[in-house]
Amino acid sequence: LGDVYKRQEVYERVGELLSRYKSGPLPKAFKIIPSLPAWEDIVYITNPEMWTPHATLAATRIFVSNLKPAQCERFYQLVLLDKIRDEIRENKKVSYQMYEAIKKSIYKPAAFFKGILFPLCDGGGVTLKEAAIIGSVIAKVSIPVLHSAAALLRLAEMEYTGPTSLFIRILLDKKYALPYKTIDALVYHFLQFADKSRGVEVTRTRAGVVGERRMPVLWHQSLLVFAQRYKSDLTPDQKSALLDLIRVQRHAGIEPEIRRELSTGESRGEMLPEPLEEDDDMSI
């Protein structure tokens, strides 16, 4: 029992240091936390809510380097995600140290998506400011294609929000070769709004009269990037359905570009024309 109290006291002191930490070596007692069986409880004793951004970055580096993906996911859910959101809520931005912590967290991509991105998007509570900041990090960091494909599949199946469109556009802009399962899920994601009544924004006249429903600009932008990057992976039927879609969900500036992309190029399953055999008499 004495050891328990002693450990409690040690990690409370470590927590006090982390609440003031700016630079320099961290206590050895903190560095060994990832190797302890009850590491989650130990982290809790250090009171992560009070960690400085510098301490959060240092801790993220230690945990990413020493924990397995499933454990990293827990650290992201229990500590890092809340630290990110609290800083954005208080300052409307993140510090350099927190930005670097987000970047470091993507070194374990499965843990990042399951511990930060999906919890952020689930339930529709993510703000556009949060999405813009985290999305800018995703855009700068290389992510393995299989993890990106799985993330796009999950995002496509989530309840729609504007930030979801932003994350989809950023991942599509990486131009990875995606499996058809992910392509098909994205097609369905867009086609679920082929009924105008499914639009998430409501237009109003100058007099305040409620008009028709429509999809936001972020949605049109993500559809345009999808058409630009993956039109050759779409079947003719999928292209036709998406062309019908933009006749319902219109946007004067973006719709013509989407139509042009979907109306050009090859389609999935189409045979390429065979090259003509050179006449023997013409060969040199």
Question: What would you call each of these model-derived segments?
Answer:
Residues 192-284:
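Eukaryotic acidic, Ser/Thr-rich intrinsically disordered low-complexity regions
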Residues 57, 61, 132, 136, ...:
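Residue-level signature of alpha-solenoid helical repeat scaffolds
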Residues 74-174:
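Amphipathic alpha-helical interface segments within eukaryotic helical scaffold
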Residues 154-191, 195, 199-203, 209-214, ...:
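Alpha-helical protein-protein interaction/assembly modules
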Residues 28-111:
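Surface-facing alpha-helical segments and adjacent helix-coil boundary elements at the starts of domains
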Residues 9-12, 50-58, 71, 89, ...:
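Residues within HEAT/ARM-like alpha-solenoid scaffolds
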Residues 72-77, 95, 110-114, 148-149, ...:
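Core helices of alpha-solenoid repeat scaffolds
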Residues 2-5:
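Short, small-residue-biased leader/transition segments that mark boundaries at the very start
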